[in-house]
């Protein structure tokens, strides 16, 4: 799992950032990349949610744009709940984990998560080689950011 990166695009709240760090620590992933995060992403709130995963929070790399965050990645999975342009061929989280784990150990694989309120833009999904969606109920399809990250990390871990 050392070659797995979690990329959060413009996370809006420190609580979600801290919660993602905790999930990452639970599943043995340490490479967190933040694209234009909220100013207070390292706040006391975030640290409380991270609990014993402050190391991940402190070592998170910050980028101005997604292109920079993915510059060294060999494969990027863009997560989305929306169906539209360029989004016909979706993988499930389980299928994406199988593909990610089949990559050479020296290649970096990124899982890209969008904004809490509107997800990834089409131009950001264009930077990803595959699209993944979580099959949720149509009445309330949008998941909390840290919960979505946890689901993907679980699929990777059970590999």
Task: List each model region and its residues.
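Post-transcriptional modification and biogenesis factors for structured RNAs
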Residues: 1-159
């Amino acid at each position: 799992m050392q070659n797995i990166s979690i990329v959060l695009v413009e996370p809006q709240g420190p609580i979600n950032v801290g919660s993602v760090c905790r999930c990452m620590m639970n599943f043995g992933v340490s490479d967190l990349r933040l694209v234009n995060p909220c100013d207070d992403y390292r706040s006391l709130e975030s640290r409380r949610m991270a609990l014993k995963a402050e190391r991940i929070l402190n070592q998170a790399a910050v980028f101005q744009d997604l292109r920079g965050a993915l510059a060294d990645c060999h494969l990027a999975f863009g997560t989305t709940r929306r169906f539209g342009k360029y989004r016909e061929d979706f993988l499930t989280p389980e299928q994406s984990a199988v593909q990610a784990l089949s990559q050479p150990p020296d290649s970096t694989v990124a899982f890209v998560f969008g904004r809490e309120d509107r997800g990834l833009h089409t131009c950001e999904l264009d930077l990803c080689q595959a699209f993944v969606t979580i099959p949720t109920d149509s009445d309330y399809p949008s998941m909390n950011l840290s919960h979505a990250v946890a689901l993907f990390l679980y699929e990777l871990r059970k590999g």
